[in-house]
Regions:
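Short phosphate-engaging motifs
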Residues: 25, 63, 86
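C-terminal core of ALDH-fold dehydrogenases
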Residues: 69-178
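Short acidic-hydrophobic, aromatic-tinged amphipathic segments that line or gate anion-handling sites
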Residues: 55-61
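A conserved active-site cap/scaffold subdomain adjacent to cofactor or substrate pockets
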Residues: 1-51, 55
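Short amphipathic alpha-helices in soluble, non-transmembrane regions
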Residues: 32, 67-70
Length: 178
């Protein structure tokens, strides 16, 4: 419950979701949420966020990684007997926290992973900010005569399809196809 609140207190759009197949756990978390929210200075924000997202009952444990990858959470906390199995299937999450002694707040403030993470499902196509975002990269392309001859028809067809005749001609002229 505390970890759900830690996410929900950010704003009403914060995605704080508990997914479980254990109805007793869900009941216990709901009771704990009620108690903890009473003391929270940002109670209104957290309560609205939890109403927007909150708790999902999982009927098929095998679909958990599929659900995680669709949600693509900014923070994923795993508290199961099957953490290692689940992690192998997770492709879309900003940061992953494993076990009851690894709350997201530790990752935000002191454990070392970046706090700038993809939110609102954007972990499906991006990662957290890293040193790579501050590096300048470039591509070097060197094609041989044989290489351009092999690639020319594909490039020419694509260029024509995009109505970029200059692109097509820049390849044709190199292989003497006018």
């Amino acid at each position: 419950a505390a970890d759900l609140i830690a996410q929900a207190e950010h704003d009403v759009y914060a995605q704080s979701i508990l997914i479980s197949d254990n109805k007793n756990l869900i009941s216990s978390v709901n009771l704990s949420l009620e108690k903890q929210l009473k003391k929270l200075p940002k109670k209104k924000i957290a309560t609205k966020s939890l109403k927007n997202f909150g708790i999902a009952i999982l009927s098929n444990r095998n679909s958990i990684t599929e659900i995680i990858n669709i949600i693509a959470p900014e923070h994923l906390e795993l508290y199961t007997k099957f953490n290692n199995k689940i992690i192998k299937g997770v492709k879309n999450a900003g940061s992953i926290f494993i076990g009851k002694y690894s709350p997201e707040a530790i990752g935000d403030y002191i454990a070392g992973p970046n706090h700038v993470l993809p939110t609102s499902g954007t972990a499906r196509f991006s990662s957290g900010l890293s040193v790579n975002d501050f590096l300048k990269r470039h591509s070097i392309i060197k094609i041989t005569k044989t290489g351009i001859e092999r690639l020319s028809s594909s490039v020419i067809n694509l260029a024509k399809h995009e109505n970029l005749d200059g692109h097509a001609y820049s390849v044709k002229i190199r292989i003497n196809k006018d």
